[in-house]
């Protein structure tokens, strides 16, 4: 890493750490920002880098949320009784119970969806292009419906999460730190991953899967790993989000296909898919626009969002980063040979 | 669940009720599905906003009925208005995403879906609305089986439209142009077909069909700005299962899906109806994929 | 592979810049406990989303009461007169958003007095937040019984809990059965409920009562939220012929049930459902809605009164006059107005803006409003106001149970719709 880029990384980290202290009233919103960053990054691994556009990554988010909830509650109480509509039991988690539950919950919330991703890969990854997209959307909807019908986890009534011990202010900061940590870890991991041959392989799958197979690439293995990586981080995000929100239920909180599920895609496209920083930029821009429209354009926020998606998709395909790359290629280390009497060598694209 | 199956065994007349309900529901799905299949087959655009076009048609019908026009009569002006709307959307949005990759078109129509839902919500409010057809119902088997006349009419209309579409595509010049473009756009262009007009026409016809479906739905059930997704999902399931070019298959699949939903609702419980639809989608996709894989393997 | 790391220096700058922009827009927190002469109450409520109709009913109720109280001189605390005002946010009918927005209302806007959201799900998400920050909330639109088993000290609910909505129907059925010489435990129940916290609580109330009288439940379906077709469920009811049919699925559920019951020729001697008024059953379906029993938190014929609105009938007249888009007053609106009255009363008794004093004042509430009697249990729910059953007779809602409040006798059994 160059010195300049290291400084910038540290600056961002510092801004991230300072934010909840500078604007304490917005801590929870900022935590959601980090979740968005994580959403965009994990989506890009599948969609941007590998060319498998998933509309159902939100499944892992919801799975993580529910697994964590069940673990947190189940360690101390009977889950079925806890979620029952009647005869609600008096609930009181000690600090130790809460933290162990949370830690174990987050851990399992990462592992569980990863395993599910591996299984789903085996089933769905034979589908190509739009069929894969529709198939994953179907999985997400099915997950929501089935969870709604399962009364052990509360069904449509949802689950009230255990309350965070510790005074007001502490809770927000704790989860903010956790979300930021998750997003940063995801970034570091993906950054490393994209510097290995793994990324070459998945890019090859994106560019031409049949040829890649013909060249001897075990595409199935790579596809499964890519999806599992996404699932791992999404599960963690789900667990944290569920605890932060305090009350979870299947259709809108855990498996919000039409909101978060699509936001993932929109953010990445906005920023420029297939790059490391594109999703992050996209997430930032998207998040900012969303918060602004929610506050100042109440009633019109979704229209603004819909229009943004349309404009982005129709007129601004390559996203912010792609657009910048085209305009100022030298910023990205791409050398465009403009000497008139030579055949223009476009340089390698990142 | 077994109790419910027993009912069907002990009193077979209820099978008829389920069949009739299912087929009338399926007929409406069929309408929505062939519009989708038409657009998908010709332009490769997968219109995620299909259900929202349907809702819009329903609301236009509602608005016209508030001015005293009977819903059945309103179908014609609604179809015309939706046709025009479809043309407009094609020009503004669809035209630019046709050449792009398939996922992009999915996302563009998704953005359109969100926008349309919200505009409908702002204009008409979030209440569910329903239209009175003023028709009665047929009672059969001593009142054991009831079917409203409007459902029978809807079924008839779907058949008529299906036949009309098939004839249009087979016999008319424009129909041939559409089929040519679907097969190979470049070749069609070389042969002088104005593919741009073909695409616009296809999309607008779809929009009109959705409009008609919307008015029917408002008469049989309810419309609400956010209910479009239920129809979009089912249309996708039907088209994916039946394949793109095969209109008779689309109808058969749609009717089948309608009946299957009724049975799953009866036997398993209404909460599993949506899950059944989605589960079916996944099954079909996976089955398709295994077939393709076997095909690929056999080629090797 | 190396290039894109270098070049993204600009990218990073963009990210930092955007983050700072968000911060700048966020601005500094405003302390809005009482600005000058205005007491600001806060509410995250369903302005959009699937409960937007009910959210509108509730917020119209809130606003109507605020306007009336302000017209009457506002609230006097220690000799100073304050007007009331409400700051709204849209929670899009989503619990997660409700919780987030309440954090914002309390932390950023500094508001210390909360009016509840619409719906049990959003209220369930809101209660832990207000509890954590020790901010009192008066809610009148979240009826789930499970809200009152957690020992919340800062939440006060003016309405009757959800399990009481349709339970009186079963009581009534038992009474009517015995009067006509039938054995109550021979009665069969067919029911369908939407799969959401409120409706499932209503269901539990019915299940508990059915168990008490030993009645058998023969159809028990859940309606998924996005479907507007229950014909499969109704076909089952046609086959099994229950004596009592109950539905709860918010406005959409009532509309769908009434229409499809007529279409499929389904009937029972007792038919009951929630949300009849918001579904506008009498205007939409006319004769097909006759005989349906509708629980309500409030009816304009009840004999409650207070100093702000007068009698229930006075409130009814005034609300309809001020809101021409309503043909009847939905109880969500009446509840909303009641909640604001409770706050005003608490301010008056506490003579303070301090949240702890107000919490204690709220806990000690013992008043009659046009909406009903208000007295809170230790858990926060209103134990002084029963649910009332009305029946649609001749296109009007008529109170039929509990018998001591009845204006007319109940029509039983319900006649089939032609």
Regions found by a protein language model. Name each.
Chain A
Residues 1-350:
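Transmembrane alpha-helices and adjacent helix-loop boundaries
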